[in-house]
């Protein structure tokens, strides 16, 4: 069972943490402001 090898566990933990950090940065920098701008645009258009 490779899951019981500590190096395998640390490798999986490191890459999982790295992937979550990269996804968090991408979402906070690019995707969420784009969704917010789209929502605000729809809100302003509907109030006209």
UniProtKB/Swiss-Prot annotation:
Q: Which controlled-vocabulary keywords does the entry list?
A: ATP synthesis, CF(0), Hydrogen ion transport, Ion transport, Membrane, Mitochondrion, Transmembrane, Transmembrane helix, Transport
* Keyword Transmembrane recorded: yes
Q: State if Transport is listed as a keyword.
A: yes
Identify the domain of life: Eukaryota
Where is this protein found? Mitochondrion membrane
> What exactly does this protein do?
Mitochondrial membrane ATP synthase (F(1)F(0) ATP synthase or Complex V) produces ATP from ADP in the presence of a proton gradient across the membrane which is generated by electron transport complexes of the respiratory chain. F-type ATPases consist of two structural domains, F(1) - containing the extramembraneous catalytic core and F(0) - containing the membrane proton channel, linked together by a central stalk and a peripheral stalk. During catalysis, ATP synthesis in the catalytic domain of F(1) is coupled via a rotary mechanism of the central stalk subunits to proton translocation.
Quaternary context = F-type ATPases have 2 components, CF(1) - the catalytic core - and CF(0) - the membrane proton channel.
The protein depicted here goes by the name ATP synthase protein 8
Q: Source species, please?
A: Vanderwaltozyma polyspora (strain ATCC 22028 / DSM 70294 / BCRC 21397 / CBS 2163 / NBRC 10782 / NRRL Y-8283 / UCD 57-17) (Kluyveromyces polysporus)
